[in-house]
Amino acid sequence: EGFLLNGKSVKIKGVNIHHDLGCMGVAAYDDALLRRLLKLRSIGCNAIRTAHNPHSESLLEMCDSLGLLVMNEFIDEWKVAKKKWITERAKEDAPDSISIGYTRYFDTHAEHDLKSFIRRDRNHPCVILWSIGNEIEWTYPYYWASSKDNKGFKGLIHTGDPETDNKSILKEFNRLSGGKDDLAETAAVLAGWVKDVDTTRPVSSGVVVPSVSRLSGYTDVLDVVGYNYKDKYYEIDHKLYPYQPIIGSENVGQLFEWTAVADKKYIAGIFVWTGFDYLGENGPWPARGGDCSFFDFVGNKTARGHFFECLWKDTPKTHIVTIPEKESEFKMDTDGSFTYTPRPGWIRRWEWYDTRDKWKYRRDEDILVQVYTNAPEVELFLNGKSLGTKKRSDFMEHNILMWKVA
């Protein structure tokens, strides 16, 4: 039945957030945290996932009072360091001092740290899930190499169609792992430590290779299975494992991620990556961080934020953006319809459409006007002259109404 709050079904409209505050650094300034939470709530967000480490207790206190739900996450890596942003993205061999994080302390500190984390936060009513990890499969190559749609990094893992040949997957998994799976064993230990301290909330984790993790025993120790970028697996896995709740623990901020869960009662909801821009995972200079969010570093609402506000709130809303047609991925056909040709590259799934919040162009430019709305139809005016009324039902593929202004 998805997620029930006081016996009532509630769809989780969540976001992932990092603990940094942009140029203010990683100190937890209460005023800045509250400002961010209020902005998230203003667009219909009702939940956050603390990616990928414990956040400040003051953040949880604010979520308690604001009515925001929390998927409270412990750690991003276990016994094996990820290193993916050093060795995979940058293609650099980095010293252990900067490429290995909590891994070096896991064996000696994990039990104490996890239990202390649970004890600190267990009395916060906002906490609905304990997450013991995130995309841990990345650190065990025999996981992502055991399934045909998971043959490596750079997004291939996120785009494959559901693979259902469980017999072949398991055979390959056993061959590559040598019959011993440290990941599943560690997950069982961590889940047990959580239950030692708190049995009132379910244990979850952000799983990124469910086609393998469902067979290895990894997900057997989870009460709720978090799916990272695997919307194509929701329906088939619900049929195969109807007894185990699932949730979108990490999702790109695109329409298809929301439509995949909006009308499915058995999925609790999603956590979009991300609520705010964050330090790290940046592109070429001068970028300082990730920009795939609903709000930028200083709190300005992005086009994506306006779009999701139309999805998540019933309050009437219309937001207009523009782009020269020659710079857009959308092109108007001779019949007045629009064709979408996305830019190549695996990172495109996280990027929003190119848009501008302005109307300042040359007279000889062909401009695409795009409208985000939750209204059934919109009429566009330019200098008092109507350019026509368009229905949202005619633009359901992208949920963006469009006009070409020549």
Where are the predicted features?
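Substrate-binding clefts and catalytic carboxylate motifs of secreted carbohydrate-active enzymes
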Residues: 125-131, 137-406
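Active-site-adjacent substrate/metal-binding segments within catalytic domains
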Residues: 1-142, 185-189, 203
